[in-house]
Amino acid sequence: MQVHIELKKVVDNSYDITIGTLPTLHFDTKVAVVTNSTISALHLEYLLSKISAKELYVVTLRDGEEYKNQQSIDTILEALFENRFNRKSMIIAFGGGVIGDMSGYAASIYQRGIDFIQIPTTLLSQVDASVGGKTGMNNRYGKNLVGAFHQPRAVYIDPHFLTTLPPREFGAGVAEIVKMAVTFDKDFFEFLERADLSKPEILQEAIKKALQTKAKVVTQDEKEQGIRAALNYGHTFGHVVENETAYKEFLHGEAVAIGMVMANEMAIKMNYMFEKEALRVKALLQKYNLPTTYAIKDVKAFYEAFFLDKKSSDSAITFILPLGIGDVVITDKVDTGTIMCVLNKFGKQ
């Protein structure tokens, strides 16, 4: 005996990304602004001057990837419960990628889902993390292993927030821009080689190009069942680097930069990429003072950590490897010998 449930309705998760000065936002509901202590001190007053709401609350978390955990999620949820938020209430994620991911995840599970808006304040979150609906938190097994797809209702990219960005945070954002270019757009990569991203008008053009690339990919593959997985270039290795260093040595974008160099090394071994192309990628990363070397502490443990990657299975590790600049392949056909050869090379540095 069977009872069939027909669930083929298409949910419209469309939204706009607005680039420019943040407009005044009006809400006829309760709103919780989730931020961290650093952004609160720098920009919260400016943000609050732009918000009109029925009731407005601020949830301030500690700053850092090491706080992207269940305790921080519980802090957000407690604030929502204590102030009687309902399904029509709203969360505003005001910070970098960590705040955006956790705010979105809290929104996805509170009363089985409420709306949220992204107002990213770092270059990395403006060009990548705020768009696409990936939300989540870390645990002791790895990065972003707990989470959900939950699209924001809107994203506001205000360059004003980048004026206080530390140089390392700026570089971390550039790493994600480079990732987009290597993955999908050779012309964009060549633009970045020529560009001086310290100039605001050139940076804004790079942000726009990166967002256009991300939007195109997410439109085609919202839940990462195919082409969107290509945007994890550098992340398979990078996430292990972050976890191995307890999220304290490298910013996320810095770990991704290291991961791209490692992925390129594997692509060379697989005859997917010429060494001269890998050197161009490395040079572009170094142009913005990003790390491109890493000494793996325990090669065997590093290898085993790959199996916790969301793209991998019990028996195969999925890698995103460049086919030159502007194209990549998603493959689980890399043999153990090749993987260990690459890891051993980095283990000897």
UniProtKB/Swiss-Prot annotation:
SUPFAM superfamilies: Dehydroquinate synthase-like (SSF56796)
Main location: cytoplasm
Sites where the protein binds NAD(+): 63-68, 97-101, 121-122, 134, 143, 161-164
Cofactor: how bound: Binds 1 divalent metal cation per subunit. Can use either Co(2+) or Zn(2+).
Binding residue positions for Zn(2+): E176, H235, H252
Reaction catalyzed: 7-phospho-2-dehydro-3-deoxy-D-arabino-heptonate = 3-dehydroquinate + phosphate
Any one Gene Ontology cellular component term annotated for this protein: cytoplasm
A biological process term (GO) from this entry: amino acid biosynthetic process
A single MF term (Gene Ontology): metal ion binding
Enzyme Commission number(s) of this protein: 4.2.3.4
Keywords: Amino-acid biosynthesis, Aromatic amino acid biosynthesis, Cobalt, Cytoplasm, Lyase, Metal-binding, NAD, Nucleotide-binding, Zinc
Pathway: Metabolic intermediate biosynthesis; chorismate biosynthesis; chorismate from D-erythrose 4-phosphate and phosphoenolpyruvate: step 2/7
InterPro entries, sorted: Dehydroquinate_synthase, DHQ_synth_AroB, DHQ_synth_fam, DHQS/DOIS_N, DHQS_C
Cofactors named for this entry: Co(2+); Zn(2+); NAD(+)
Domain of life from the UniProt record: Bacteria
Locations listed in the record: Cytoplasm
Function, in words: Catalyzes the conversion of 3-deoxy-D-arabino-heptulosonate 7-phosphate (DAHP) to dehydroquinate (DHQ).
Similarity comment text for this entry: Belongs to the sugar phosphate cyclases superfamily. Dehydroquinate synthase family.
Protein name: 3-dehydroquinate synthase
Organism: Sulfurimonas denitrificans (strain ATCC 33889 / DSM 1251)
